C-alpha cells in the first residue's frame, strides 16, 4: 500500500472515530472501546475493499457486511455516514427513543445495514447463509463478518466456521477483532485461547 492510500485511510478512520465518540457522547451510553477498535477495519473495507452503492443500498450485487459484535454499532453507523448512506448529523441521534440508530444495527430501518445483530456469536452463521446463497445462485458478491474475540468463545462461532469450510465458502471473509477485552474482563483471563491457533 502506498503512502497516499495509507494517509487517506488514516484520515477516514479518524473521521469514523470522531463519529463514534460524537454519537456515544450524545447518547450518554454505548460501547466506545469495541467500536473504536474496528474503525480501521471498517475504513478499509468500506472504502477500498467492498463494492457498495449508498444510492442503492439494497443492490443485489453489493458486497455484504455482518457486524457480529452488534454492540459496536456506533462504528458501523459512523462508517455508513462517512460513505454517504445518511448524514453524519444523524449520529447525534444514537440510542434516542425516536431515532433509527439504536444500540444494535437494524437492517429494516438503516440503509447500508445488511444484518440485524445483537446476540453475540450469531454473525458468522448469518454471513455463512448469505455466502451460501451467493455461491449457489452464482452471484459475484462477497460477505464480510466482523467478529469480536470475546464472542469467539461461543460454540456457534466454531460450528459456523466448520460449515464455511465444509461448503468451501470462498466468498466469505471473517475478520476477528482481537482487542483483548470483553465485558467480563481481559479475554486471556476469561477464556485463554491459544492465539497461535486462532490467528
Residue ranges and their predicted role:
Residues 1-16:
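N-terminal hydrophobic or amphipathic helices/low-complexity stretches enriched
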Residues 13-29, 177-178:
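N-terminal capping segment at the start of a domain
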Amino acid at each position: 500500500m502506498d503512502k497516499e492510500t495509507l494517509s487517506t485511510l488514516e484520515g477516514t478512520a479518524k473521521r469514523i472515530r470522531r463519529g463514534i465518540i460524537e454519537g456515544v457522547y450524545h447518547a450518554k451510553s454505548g460501547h466506545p472501546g469495541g467500536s473504536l477498535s474496528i474503525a480501521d477495519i471498517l475504513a478499509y473495507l468500506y472504502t477500498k475493499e467492498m463494492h457498495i452503492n449508498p444510492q442503492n443500498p439494497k443492490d443485489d450485487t453489493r458486497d455484504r457486511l455482518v457486524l457480529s459484535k452488534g454492540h459496536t454499532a456506533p462504528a458501523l453507523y459512523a462508517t455508513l455516514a462517512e460513505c454517504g448512506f445518511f448524514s453524519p448529523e444523524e449520529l447525534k441521534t444514537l440510542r434516542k427513543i425516536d431515532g433509527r440508530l439504536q444500540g444494535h444495527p437494524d437492517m429494516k430501518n438503516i440503509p447500508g445495514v445488511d444484518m440485524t445483530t445483537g446476540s453475540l456469536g450469531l454473525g458468522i452463521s448469518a454471513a455463512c447463509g448469505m455466502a451460501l446463497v451467493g455461491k449457489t445462485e452464482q452471484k459475484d458478491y462477497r460477505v464480510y463478518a466482523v467478529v469480536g474475540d470475546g464472542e469467539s468463545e461461543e460454540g456457534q462461532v466454531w460450528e459456523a466456521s466448520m460449515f464455511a469450510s465444509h461448503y468451501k465458502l470462498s466468498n466469505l471473509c471473517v475478520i476477528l477483532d482481537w482487542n483483548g477485552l470483553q465485558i467480563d474482563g481481559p479475554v486471556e483471563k476469561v477464556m485463554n485461547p491459544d492465539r497461535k491457533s486462532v490467528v
